[in-house]
Amino acid sequence: MPKILIVEDEINLRDVYSSRLEAESYTISVASNGEEALAVAVRDRPDLILLDVMLPKISGFDVLDIIRTTPEIAHTRVIMMTALSAPKDKERGEKLGVDKFLVKSQVTLEEVVSTIKSVLDSSAAATTQNEQVLGSTGTQRSASASTAEPAAPAPPANQPPANQPPAN
């Protein structure tokens, strides 16, 4: 099952999210601040991070910015969960590369679970599609490399190809 890192400084919310997602058979790790989140993300390489914005030590926005510039975890899916509901906050998250931006007061726990499934499903579909493209490309390359003959040099501009008689 996919691994999810829950980054939430509010212990009750962290416990609720953890319990609910474990019931869906996700493997859960948790962090209570931005600094810890980055360490756990690099160590555990989660498939998805559920990230609060207002965190101690390093804000969720700064955590996301660091995630997107850290090669080992740059492609990790991130859902921001926050009390911030201003459009500028959502825009900031989108500019930093968040996959989904949810306002805590506007979603139920079941909507959070549904969003997580949707983001993970789209991630899996994209991975499968990329593997198919790479796989078929790799197969074509290896097949053509083993069976292709070197191309014959082009004839000079004023001469017909060698296998055709000259025109009179």
What are these regions (language model features)?
Residues 121-168:
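CheY-like receiver
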Residues 11-29:
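Two-component/phosphorelay signaling modules centered on CheY-like receiver
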Residues 8:
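Conserved acidic carboxylate
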